[in-house]
Amino acid sequence: MIEGAASRETIEFLLTCSGFTGEPMVDQIPNLGRESEMLSEIGLSSMSELFSNIPEGVRRKNPLPLPPPQSEEQILEDARRLLGANVDLDSRPSFLSAGLARNFVPSMVPMLATRGEFLTSYTPYQPEVSQGMLQAMWEFQTMVSELVGLPISNVSMYDASTAAAEAITCAVRVKSKKATDPNSVFVSELVPPHRLSVIRNYTQGVGIELRILPHNDDGSLDMELASSAAGSSAVYVEQPNALGILDEGLMGLKEVIGDSTALIVGVDAVSLGLVEPPGHWGADIVVGEGQPFGIGPTGGGPIYGIFACTKEFLRLMPGRIVGQSIDTEGKTAYTLTLSTREQHIRRHRATSNICSNETLIALMGAMHMSLLGPEGLEKLATRISSSTYAVMEAVTKIPGVELVNPGGAFFREFAIRLPGPAKDALSSMDASGVLGGFDLGNWWEEMSDCLLIGCDEGITESDISSLVDALGAWSGGVE
């Protein structure tokens, strides 16, 4: 028994008073008596005998240098102290984005998501999944389809990067018989390098050749050179792209590449509250980060990706699909459909290696979207757009700071060029209590003097003033 812990008799008395009639967990607290019982049960007399098959050379000679036991209060205090060293995006003005968005999630979302009907460690892929869970998954699919303007959606991917990579391999499977250059896929040069890296990991082992499509100086896709992609299996572009640019020319890209080449578009899902969805201007597959709906940005924690497509790709698309059907009594019923595409059915013929997906997080996204509704989404997108241009106008007035792509249309993000290294500017602003953005030199070495400024619905005039003051103070001191 740990020194200072309550005795078994005390715990049993308290449990009895509370009406508890099960076995108390106190039996699981380590003690020598229980150790002897367990050894006796398996026919051994000592711990050394239990571990006798482990070679002496790999055994630890000294006990682990663990700290002494602590009370619950002490543990919580230590945890708070350690967590206090983290930078909280909500405790200071933050203009950091570059893929994940700071957002407001209504409190009803986590409240509903933590109900026992949803919160489970079990991945819902078996036929006996409850009708309530299946309907919620189907509602998510419906919302995503309406959002991007395409008829088919799955129940989420891991994130935007894996969704993009899976979209490309799916397109090659479907279009290879029609394409004149079936093993080639063209990718915009203004795709975040980490996403391009994931795409390469998915494609290089299956013989798919990636070719890069260049952009003009204003950040728009070079449509003349894009015509060379006609005949390939797919073209992948993003709207907005990695620099936050909304490229109007992309709306004519499908006409340029033709029907034999799949057009895959990565989106900022919130932007679709303002801009026309890609499904309306020829996209065959739409992917994106679902994170702005349902969950805040995480440092390695779970998020989810969206994946929607036309019916042409239905039987070879990745991920779980819920269909609406009729049961034997003629009532509406929901069911997992086309499951033979998935690896838990036929691993060697599966269209994807995704299995344990992001269903719970995706359902949180569906809850968030349902609370917003179409009008709420439009207002949210408008607020973000307004914040983007307000911040842009303010920072470009600072001497020595200029917009990288002047004249373009932007959503959520834009890039500025500085009179010195972006990493120095960020360090200076951090010392002033401002998270000033993302150093684009981390993505492209030639842009080491550029910052990607991210904006969200929570940006205030005070935040903008703090950014201008901090960036202006650094810029004025650069020689």
Task: Please give the residue ranges for each predicted region.
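Active-site C-terminal subdomain of aminotransferase-like
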Residues: 293-399, 404-407
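Compact, charge-rich alpha-helical regulatory domains located at protein termini
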Residues: 25-38, 42, 46-47, 54-58
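Short, Lys/Arg-enriched N-terminal segments with co-localized hydrophobic residues
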Residues: 9-24
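N-terminal entrance/gating region of PLP-dependent enzymes' catalytic architecture
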Residues: 59-139
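Short loop-beta-helix segment that forms the pyridoxal 5′-phosphate
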Residues: 125-129, 146-165
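Gly-rich Lys/Arg/Thr-decorated short loops/hinges at beta-loop-alpha junctions or inter-strand turns
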Residues: 115-127, 145-150, 180-182, 203-204, ...
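Conserved C-terminal alpha-helix-loop-beta "cap" of PLP-dependent enzymes
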Residues: 375-469
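Conserved PLP-enzyme active-site core in the AAT-like
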Residues: 26, 162-335, 416-419, 423-429, ...
